[in-house]
Amino acid sequence: MILLELQEQLRAEYNPDGSLLRRQQMKMLDILLRVDKFCKEHDIKYWLSSGTLLGAVRHGGFIPWDDDVDIEMMREDYLRFVRLFEDDDDLVLHTHKNDLHYIMPYAKVRDRHSVIEEHSGGENFKYKGIFIDVFALEYTHKFVNHQMHMKLRRIRKFEHRYKRNRMVDAIISLRKEYAFATIKAWRFISNLLPGKQLRHTLGTWCYRKARYEEDLFPLTTVQFEGYTFPAPHDSDAYLRKIYGDYMQLPAEKEVHTLKIEFLG
């Protein structure tokens, strides 16, 4: 972990208590705690991943300028998670199945009492609250994963090209239904090819690095914002394969959120 003095300087600069970013981070932490409780109740194994794990290891919590939370789980657990998770007055599980304009193969658990505007779009999403991302991992081939990603990307580009109306929505619905229906065929093709690796589920291209079971299992724990969460067995190896020298602070601090509104 970085020196406490440096950590305090970064907090003061990027996410001091009471700032919009810190309020967003605390809301994401609330969602993560709810998801953690749910996963424990249903014996669903997950772990902090990507930048969230990096924040835990390097900062003991959120990277001061970070505005998202990522968790990963194996595809079998992901399918159970999506099947068993129940929406309530505070949270909703956002997937391609309950929103025509959500064209991603992974889920978000969203807060119902906030609205965010992101660089990556989402203006047509049915649900727009603060969220955490839930990613599935499966053994697949990089080429097949990329082909599925390009298919979904073309649908998103089509959506952004035309003004919304019933005909455009109908075309999006048909193309999206066809694209997700072909995942089974792509998965079959992938199983025939050599060189499969543990990667994010077909069509997910925001994280292109492979994962390795020896780095992940058996799971251990890590401290994050004063709470204990599941983590990969070898977080150092996991992070180095993704980020290289992850203890080195980046020159540019990437932020995804443009605007936040807290409701009520």
Region annotations inferred by a language model:
Residues 79-83:
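Short, conserved charged micro-motifs
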Residues 1-4:
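Short, solvent-exposed beta-strand-terminating loops
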Residues 6-42, 85-142, 168-244, 249-264:
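Conserved catalytic core of two-metal-ion nucleotidyltransferases
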Residues 36-69, 78:
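Active-site nucleotide-donor binding segment shared across nucleotidyl transfer reactions
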Residues 139, 151-153:
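Aromatic- and glycine-enriched beta-alpha-beta binding-site module
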Residues 153-169:
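Short, cationic low-complexity segments
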Residues 143-149:
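A short secondary-structure junction signal
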Residues 72-74:
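Short hydrophobic/aromatic beta-strand micro-patches
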